[in-house]
Amino acid sequence: MVYMREDLPAVARDAASAITRWLEAMPETVSVRDVADDPQYRARHIDLLWTRRTTDGTCTEESIRVRGERYGHTGEYHIEAVSGADETSPESMVATEADYLYYYFLPRAELHILPMQQMRGWLREHGAEMRQLRPPTVLDSADGVEVGRLVSRDRLLREVGGIRVVQIRPRAA
């Protein structure tokens, strides 16, 4: 899939907005902070910080990378890789340093929550099996050329523990 450059901000904005509303509606939420434009977090590919109260009453903060997707029919996730890095090194498999990747399919209002600790381990083991995107399917973004791997959703759901799929109710018009 290839997005036109002008479509990218709208997709990302719509996904982040829907996810933020969903998180804010949860009773355990203390705050949701959009840090996508903060250079400190942008460099680490982190978009949101979610502070929530745990069952024991303490607060915890989770970092989230948001990925918006209009085309849910491919059966694959696009996992961002580190641009310009050695493709075979484990460090190059995933660009984000976030705790979670929230992969949101806009037309279906379906959110896939991928725990990045488990994902990193799985990608270290299996990343070389995944197809890496090459031009012309790489995206020229504000952060440089976006490269990545196409990873089967079905395979990840089978092989990586902790992935959740949530239906987000769209906001009433």
Give the ranges of each region predicted by the language model.
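Short connector loops at helix/strand junctions that flank enzyme active sites
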Residues: 43-45, 57-61, 74, 95-98
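Acidic-basic catalytic patches of nuclease active cores, encompassing PD-(D/E)XK
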Residues: 1-42, 70-73
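Non-catalytic C-terminal interaction segments of nucleic acid-processing enzymes
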Residues: 3-7, 21, 55-58, 106-173
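Catalytic cores of nucleic-acid endonucleases
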Residues: 2-9, 66-111
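Conserved catalytic cores of phosphodiester-cleaving nucleases, focusing on short active-site segments
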Residues: 48-72
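Short, conserved, surface-exposed binding loops centered on an aromatic residue
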Residues: 40, 49-55, 91-95, 103
